[in-house]
């Protein structure tokens, strides 16, 4: 009331120091004359290349010790090149623009190419990118849009998905030295001992795999033992992709056994084709497959890979039971080929072999299965019976039921 104070907004924005005192980085196209005035390096002298023969063991910035490299003539004046280099974020903040015009020798990117390709449909990365790299990238796009009205791009990424980490238990010996899973063994799955001298191991919490804690798993070893498809299947089946994956040998073995079951199911399909029966439940099988196509397509769009794997377990149980009943050859081929196509992103090597064996029964069409909407339409309609405005009953009747 006494008007002794006034409103003021203090922004927490600060200048961003983009230079670094190190060799590995993009040279800054700035030089200094003998009076220490700033001089722009002419475009015809760009790009500036870093010296290849350099001693990285010197104190401070290694480029400060490269006298010959720093000496440059600009407009007949002796100048000294800037020895600071740009932070790596400066380069990584607009690399996707360069991908649009990779062969352009005159400019970093072409506006017409940007209009055609950008923005990026989907960005997938660690959660730390959301507060660093993506923030810088957006700033660059805003700045370019501000400086060039033809740029017309402010949001570089339409979608962001941050995946979880792969985790594993940690192990230490009696001297608190980290141990790798290959250096220990267990007979009961609870108590662990060292392979070398049979000393009990301290089991720590499950943490994201890292070389420092030595809780990593060699993927090549897993692939050699179980196959690439089993490794791929387990990683996607264990948990939602935005959550951490808890690595376990039991989980790997479970995925491996499921692929074996799928192979036996494949053999049943091949055997069933030779019978050429008249199907009693062809319509039900086709309806089930179309429902599965719809589920998996929707789950793919929302990155629900673990739910898709659960759908495949249900699919196995359904067809393992249905193959005991008569199915027409046409229905069998059409539905099974679609099933293999649905499986292909998850177990590509397996489905490639299966489709090869099915090649004589089908056209060479590897497009993603489409849902037949008519088949999925409900055959029944719901009729609500009201008397004097009050609901008395609900009837579920077939669409083709007559008035009588």
Each model region followed by its residue ranges:
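Family-specific functional microsites
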Residues: 276-277
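S-adenosyl-L-methionine
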Residues: 280-284
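Catalytic cores of secreted or luminal carbohydrate-active enzymes
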Residues: 339-360
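C-terminal low-complexity, glycine/proline- and small-hydrophobic-enriched intrinsically disordered tails
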Residues: 246-253, 303, 310, 317, ...
């Amino acid at each position: 009331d006494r008007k002794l104070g006034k409103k003021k907004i203090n922004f927490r924005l600060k200048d961003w120091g983009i230079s670094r005192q190190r060799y590995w980085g993009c040279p800054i196209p700035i030089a200094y004359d003998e009076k220490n005035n700033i001089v722009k390096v002419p475009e015809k002298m760009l790009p500036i290349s870093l010296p290849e023969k350099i001693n990285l063991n010197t104190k401070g910035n290694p480029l400060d010790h490269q006298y010959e490299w720093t000496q440059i003539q600009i407009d007949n004046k002796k100048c000294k090149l800037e020895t600071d280099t740009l932070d790596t974020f400066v380069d990584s903040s607009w690399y996707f623009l360069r991908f649009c015009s990779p062969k352009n020798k005159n400019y970093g990117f072409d506006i017409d190419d940007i209009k055609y390709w950008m923005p990026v449909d989907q960005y997938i990365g660690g959660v730390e990118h959301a507060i660093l790299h993506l923030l810088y990238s957006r700033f660059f796009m805003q700045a370019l849009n501000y400086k060039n009205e033809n740029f017309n791009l402010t949001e570089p990424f339409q979608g962001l998905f941050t995946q979880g980490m792969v985790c594993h238990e940690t192990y230490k010996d009696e001297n608190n030295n980290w141990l790798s899973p290959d250096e220990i063994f267990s007979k009961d799955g609870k108590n662990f001992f060292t392979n070398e001298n049979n000393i009990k191991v301290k089991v720590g919490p499950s943490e994201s795999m890292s070389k420092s804690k030595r809780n990593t798993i060699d993927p090549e070893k897993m692939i050699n033992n179980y196959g690439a498809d089993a490794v791929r299947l387990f990683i996607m089946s264990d948990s939602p992709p935005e959550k951490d994956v808890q690595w376990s040998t039991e989980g790997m073995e479970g995925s491996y056994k499921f692929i074996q079951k799928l192979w036996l199911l494949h053999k049943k399909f091949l055997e069933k084709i030779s019978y050429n029966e008249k199907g009693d439940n062809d319509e039900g099988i086709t309806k089930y497959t179309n429902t599965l196509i719809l589920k998996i397509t929707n789950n793919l769009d929302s990155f629900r890979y673990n739910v898709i794997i659960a759908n495949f377990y249900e699919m196995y149980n359904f067809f393992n039971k249905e193959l005991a009943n008569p199915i027409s050859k046409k229905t069998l081929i059409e539905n099974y080929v679609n099933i293999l196509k649905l499986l292909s992103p998850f177990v590509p090597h397996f489905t490639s072999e299966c489709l090869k064996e099915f090649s004589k029964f089908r056209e060479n069409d590897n497009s993603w299965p489409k849902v037949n909407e008519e088949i999925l339409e409900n055959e029944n309609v719901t009729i609500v019976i009201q008397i004097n405005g009050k609901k008395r009953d609900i009837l579920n009747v077939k669409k083709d039921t007559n008035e009588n």
